């Protein structure tokens, strides 16, 4: 069942984000594809964070986090925050430079979700970057969107 479940989810395309939080001098970030818009009024987003993620206690303690929506070409950024470090990649003021958009959120709620926590954030600020194609993850790899001509 576990392998079939993973294979089924690999067939679902999703955008790629980097979620980050800072508590004192400690700043953590992680790549997340389990992210969604939850509500427009109030503006809420939700994401799933593993119980084992180093980000989780920082996010909980800070009571705030950012979500950077990655653009096509930011594969190395995604890999870096997925635990495969790349030289020269870092957060800038809690966000990924060059992202399509950055959402600055206050922690609204936390819910249990199996081996994950469901994190709900109240969006307090939106930074829009340059428009462009998003970074997409599908079938265990990064893909490009094809625009109709």
Swiss-Prot record:
Binding residues for NAD(+): 37, 116, 137-140
Keyword NAD in record: yes
Biological process according to GO: pyrimidine nucleobase catabolic process
Catalytic activity: a reduced flavin + NAD(+) = an oxidized flavin + NADH + 2 H(+)
Subunit and interaction comment: Homodimer. 4-HPA 3-monooxygenase consists of a reductase component HpaC and an oxygenase component HpaB.
NCBIfam families documented for this protein: HpaC_Thermus
Protein name: 4-hydroxyphenylacetate 3-monooxygenase, reductase component
């Amino acid at each position: 069942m576990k392998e079939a479940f993973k294979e089924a989810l690999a067939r679902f395309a999703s955008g790629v984000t980097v979620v980050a939080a800072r508590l004192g001098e400690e700043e953590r970030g992680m790549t997340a594809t389990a992210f969604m818009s939850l509500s427009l009024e109030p503006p809420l987003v939700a994401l799933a964070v593993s119980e084992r993620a180093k980000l989780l206690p920082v996010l909980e303690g800070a009571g705030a986090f950012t979500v950077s929506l990655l653009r096509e070409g930011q594969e190395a950024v995604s890999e870096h925050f997925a635990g495969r470090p790349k030289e020269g990649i870092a957060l800038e003021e809690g966000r990924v430079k060059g992202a399509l958009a950055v959402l600055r959120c206050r922690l609204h709620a936390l819910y249990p979700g199996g081996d994950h926590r469901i994190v709900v954030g109240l969006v307090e600020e939106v930074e829009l970057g340059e428009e462009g194609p998003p970074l997409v993850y599908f079938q265990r790899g990064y893909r490009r969107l094809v625009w109709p001509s």
